[in-house]
């Protein structure tokens, strides 16, 4: 019987500087607003992109609210990666006043 892998969590306001931040939201959410240093891989594409993710450092995984990122962090941890879920997601990121950029030149926001 497979059991979910326990993954640590962090609130976006407490995210250390310089981490590898993996954003697993959909393309339209990413375009609307994301952390400047984040790397975008849609949740549905994680399996195909697994080999391109760093295996030698912690991956902080973020989505809009923390649910998809929790699933992604557990799935990646089950494959041997060291993951941390950003439990309040980009919604918490915006509330904490952390920087955001958009891909389409509009005012960044959480979609």
Describe each region flagged by the PLM:
Residues 1-20, 26-58, 67-111:
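Rhodanese-like catalytic fold shared by cysteine-dependent sulfurtransferases
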Residues 62:
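Short, surface-exposed ligand- or partner-binding patches at beta-edge/loop junctions that are enriched
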